[in-house]
Each structure stands twice: as structure tokens, then as C-alpha cells.
């Protein structure tokens, strides 16, 4: 998702290297695990939805949410879009404002992004509350959730790989784009579809609106309550004056729900021995990478960056010209020429690090803090003691979390637990479980998910998922019955060696295999049930 600092020569070499590394057939291939051509089975074995699907809610207006809206709207569904931020764009909406400071140690993954805010029990909806002063400002910030990108961020893939098919870039675009340019492109696509934040005439879009809860909806019948979809509890927060705001809670029912909230919402900071004492003693000097905005904040400092995936390498490189020195702490297995599941810090990457960036081993522990952070010590796994550290940035990634779906969280399970009822989607936050093709809840097939895989081109991949959901819910493409879905899921888990951090990893080859699967399945369905072909 992210690229290196905006120096033309370095950036071009990084993109060329990135593409070469991505396309390299030397890189081990991790199968997506969905190799069975289940769509060739008889229609008698297909899943039947218990209610017709017409009204669909989409949670999130990033690229994948917009792609879902575009496709479902085109297919004739009544589509409603809910976005907690002020404008569309997802992670590509940059602001100088930073997210609310993350706790150390991590919050429980079920509330890793936010703690759902529900109206008082028993009140009539819509229900309002009013705020002023600092309370108002903090409410607005926490509600919209500023995104984890920084001022100098650029894309790490050429425009043709980061575009909506119906909205191509001009041919003369440079290979690397500043985040502001991509943000404008996404907003232009939203405007073209009448779903930008200023399209006030569209009653189906709601910005500044966070989905607090998604729960089963029941309708009273002669035979008792009958399940008919989903009820969403919504909270819209808006500014009413210079330092005042109000929150309005409502509820609305839908036949199906698309989760398009992305993967970069709940920060992960490893629970290293002694870290909490440092965080308590020096709270402003220890942050997650999502707080990083500008390198000037670290001028003449000695900075410890933890993590060797994309953000860690890029932030270390970005702050190096301003900093006195930078330590980049990595795990030994990250120094390799190939890695099937992530962004390796290969010898070629290391050769591009500035002279004042030193690569050091993993942190073993933080020794008891003293009166000043620079006088305190960090012990590495090889026994080295670092002192003089003035700031620490944890570029250690994010965890999957859906606070609005508490019924699908179970943090008590281990990575290798397979049997549990109800079947959770989120456990420890490193991966997702019990999703067919990683896009559809097996237990609740009216609950869809957009672009939850690792190492994919979101713009392109989102369009295939959107078409799949549209056809499945419109009975123009079939899926197996639930018993068969569970069989396929269990076989996939075994093929991938159990659950773990890279369970959702695809990469170039895995994404290509999944696109072949989507294309074969959906075009086979189009031949049987009608509808357009995908390519």
C-alpha cells in the first residue's frame, strides 16, 4: 500500500524493484486454497437464501466500498453507503490530524479500532446528544478516525494498477503518485457515481456516520419471529458551531451488509517486556506508525523504528535526513531475498537505506526507565544495549477488527482451534476465519467482506468481489450449501497449515489465481443464468 520517500531516482528504482520482486517466479507460491471447481456442481446442491436481497448496506467509502456501491447500484440493488469520515477515500484521505493515541499494551481486538457508542437503553430513536469544547473536538476525532498515512506518502504501484476500470487514469500519469493525487482521483470517482460527500441530493449516502452495531433483524409473523436480515445502529456526528457538535443515533434494516472498512484500523504493538513501563513514563515518545505525519518532528533525534515491513522501512528512510540517527529493529527472518508472505527487507532493500539508518536485531526487553528516555536502555536479542533513544515508532502493523460485529469476535481461541460455536470471524486479529473465498460469511452468507486479503491490488480485486456479491445475492451465481462451504473451508485451513498471520496472504500469484477463479465461476454462471461476462 505504501511507498518510499519522494525522491525521484530512489522512487523509480523502488517501483522497478517492487514490480520485479512481485513478479519473480523465484518467490515461493502460497496457494489461496480454493482450488476445487465447486461451481460445476449441480444447481440442486446450491445455497438458497432465506429472504430476497434488495436493500444492501455498505460500511466504508474507501476504494473497495465505492467499487461495491458502483457494482451493486448498477445491478439494481437499493444500496446505502455509510462512512465515518467526512469524505470518501479510506486510507487515502490524508489530514494532519492524528488518530486517538493507541493504548500500550493493545486494547482487546474486539475494540481495537473503537468502542461502539450505543444510545441509552430504552430511548426513542432518533436520539440526540450535544457536546462542546474539548469534548466536542475529541469526539469528532475519535468518530472519524484519521487515517494512517503521512505527508510525503506516495503510491507503490503504477496508476494502471490503482484505478477503477470504468474510470482510467490519463496515459501521461507518472508511475508514482502523491497520496493527494490518488485521494482526488477516488473522490472524482465518487462524484461521477453521485456518492461524494457533497452529493447532498442522494439520500442513500451518509458521511460522518459510524456503524456502531450490526445485529440480526427479526419480523413478527403468525408463526413467531422470523429472521429477515440485519439491523444497523448508526451514529452520525456533525459540527454545529466553532466548538460544538451533536450526535444522532438511528437504526435501519437491510437485507445484506458489505463490510468495506479495510485492514488498517486497529494498531498492533508487540507486548515486549518492559515496554508498558516506558510507555507510562514517556507517553509522547512512543507511538504507532499511524501517528506519523512529518519527519521534521524527529529533527536531530535518535529514533528507533520497530518493524521491517513497508511502513517501517519507508518511515525510517523518510525521517533519516532530519534525524541524527535511526535504528531499524527487525526480526532475523526478515533479512532474506524472498519471502512468500510479506515485504522482505532483502539485501537490495538494505542497500537503499540512508547511511544513518542502522539495521539492528529484534528487541528483547526495555530495561527499567530512568528520568529521561535518552538515559534509558533497550536490550536487543543479541545482547546489544541501545541508549540515547529519544523517540520510538512501532511500524508493527494492524489487526483485523470489526467492533460493530461483536458476535463474530472470540479472542479466547488459539490459531489452531478449528471447532467452536458460534463460528468466529476474528480471534486474535492476525487473520480472519470462516469466510468463503474471504468474501462471504459461511454462517451468514448475507454478510460480505471487501478486500480483506494481504498483498493485493485493491482497486482491481475489489471489482471482482463486488461482481461476485452482486451475482450471488441476485441468484445469478450459485454457491454450495453451507455443509459444503464448511468442508471447503476446513480443507483450505489444512492446506495452508492452520490459521496464522498470513492466512489471508495472496500476493501477485495468489491474486492472479483468485481472479482466474472469479472469472471462471462468474462467467460460467453468466452462461447459465444470464448477465454480463467479467474479464
Swiss-Prot record:
Residues 1-24 form the signal peptide. FAD binds at residues 60-65. Glycans are attached at residues 134, 243, 300, 356, 382, 410. NADP(+) binds at residues 307-312. It comes from the Eukaryota. Flavin-containing monooxygenase; part of the gene cluster that mediates the biosynthesis of the psychoactive metabolites ibotenic acid and muscimol. The first committed step is glutamate hydroxylation by the 2-oxoglutarate-dependent dioxygenase iboH, and the last step is decarboxylation of ibotenic acid to muscimol by the decarboxylase iboD. The order of the intermediate reactions is somewhat ambiguous. IboA likely activates the carboxylic acid at position 5 to introduce an amide bond, and the flavin monooxygenase iboF generates the N-O bond. There are several options for the latter step. Belongs to the FMO family. This is Flavin-containing monooxygenase iboF. It comes from Amanita muscaria (strain Koide BX008). The gene is iboF.
Amino acid at each position: 500500500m505504501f511507498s518510499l520517500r519522494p525522491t525521484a531516482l530512489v522512487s523509480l528504482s523502488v517501483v522497478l524493484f517492487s514490480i520485479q520482486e512481485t513478479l519473480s517466479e523465484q518467490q515461493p507460491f502460497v496457494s489461496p486454497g480454493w482450488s476445487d471447481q465447486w461451481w460445476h456442481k449441480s444447481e440442486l446442491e446450491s445455497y438458497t437464501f432465506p429472504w430476497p436481497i434488495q436493500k444492501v448496506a455498505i460500511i466504508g467509502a474507501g476504494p473497495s466500498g465505492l467499487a461495491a456501491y458502483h457494482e451493486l447500484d448498477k445491478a439494481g440493488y437499493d444500496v446505502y453507503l455509510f462512512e465515518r469520515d467526512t469524505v470518501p477515500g479510506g486510507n487515502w484521505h490524508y489530514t494532519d490530524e492524528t488518530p486517538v493515541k493507541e493504548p500500550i499494551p493493545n486494547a482487546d481486538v474486539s475494540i481495537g479500532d473503537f468502542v461502539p457508542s450505543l444510545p441509552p437503553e430504552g430511548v426513542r430513536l432518533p436520539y440526540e446528544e450535544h457536546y462542546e469544547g474539548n469534548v466536542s473536538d475529541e469526539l469528532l476525532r475519535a468518530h472519524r478516525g484519521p487515517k494512517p498515512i503521512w505527508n510525503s506518502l506516495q503510491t507503490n504501484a503504477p496508476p494502471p494498477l490503482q484505478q477503477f476500470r470504468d474510470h482510467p487514469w490519463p496515459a501521461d500519469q507518472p508511475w508514482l503518485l502523491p497520496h493527494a493525487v490518488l485521494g482526488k482521483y477516488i473522490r472524482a470517482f465518487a462524484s461521477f457515481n453521485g456518492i461524494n460527500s457533497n452529493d447532498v441530493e442522494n439520500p442513500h449516502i451518509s458521511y460522518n456516520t459510524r456503524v456502531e452495531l450490526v445485529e440480526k433483524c427479526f419480523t413478527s409473523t403468525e408463526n413467531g419471529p422470523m429472521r429477515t436480515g440485519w439491523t444497523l445502529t448508526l451514529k452520525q456526528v456533525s459540527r454545529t458551531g466553532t466548538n460544538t457538535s451533536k450526535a444522532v443515533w438511528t437504526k435501519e434494516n437491510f437485507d445484506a451488509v458489505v463490510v468495506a472498512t479495510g485492514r488498517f484500523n486497529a494498531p498492533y504493538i508487540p507486548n515486549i517486556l518492559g515496554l508498558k513501563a516506558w510507555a507510562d513514563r514517556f507517553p509522547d515518545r512512543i507511538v504507532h506508525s499511524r501517528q506519523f505525519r512529518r519527519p521534521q518532528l524527529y529533527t536531530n533525534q535518535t529514533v528507533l523504528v520497530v518493524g521491517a515491513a513497508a511502513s517501517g522501512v519507508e518511515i525510517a528512510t523518510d525521517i533519516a535526513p532530519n534525524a541524527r540517527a535511526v535504528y531499524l529493529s527487525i526480526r532475523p527472518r526478515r533479512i532474506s531475498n524472498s519471502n512468500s508472505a510479506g515485504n522482505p527487507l532483502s539485501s537490495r532493500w538494505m542497500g537503499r537505506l540512508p547511511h544513518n539508518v542502522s539495521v539492528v536485531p529484534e528487541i528483547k526487553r526495555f530495561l527499567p526507565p530512568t528520568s529521561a528516555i535518552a538515559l534509558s536502555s533497550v536490550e536487543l536479542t543479541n545482547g546489544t544495549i541501545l541508549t540515547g533513544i529519544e523517540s520510538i515508532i512501532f511500524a508493527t502493523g494492524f489487526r483485523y477488527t470489526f467492533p460493530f460485529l461483536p458476535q463474530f469476535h472470540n479472542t479466547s481461541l488459539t490459531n489452531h482451534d478449528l471447532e467452536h460455536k458460534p463460528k468466529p470471524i476474528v480471534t486474535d486479529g492476525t487473520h480472519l476465519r470462516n469466510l468463503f473465498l474471504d468474501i462471504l460469511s459461511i454462517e451468514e452468507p448475507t454478510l460480505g467482506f471487501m478486500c480483506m486479503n494481504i498483498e493485493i491490488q485493491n482497486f482491481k480485486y475489489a471489482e471482482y468481489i463486488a461482481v461476485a456479491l452482486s451475482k450471488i445475492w441476485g441468484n445469478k451465481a450459485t454457491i454450495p450449501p453451507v455443509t459444503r462451504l464448511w468442508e471447503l473451508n476446513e480443507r483450505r485451513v489444512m492446506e495452508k497449515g492452520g490459521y496464522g498471520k498470513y492466512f489471508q496472504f495472496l500476493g501477485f500469484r495468489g491474486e492472479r489465481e483468485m481472479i482466474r477463479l472469479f472469472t471462471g465461476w462468474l462467467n460460467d454462471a453468466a452462461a447459465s443464468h444470464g448477465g454480463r461476462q467479467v474479464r
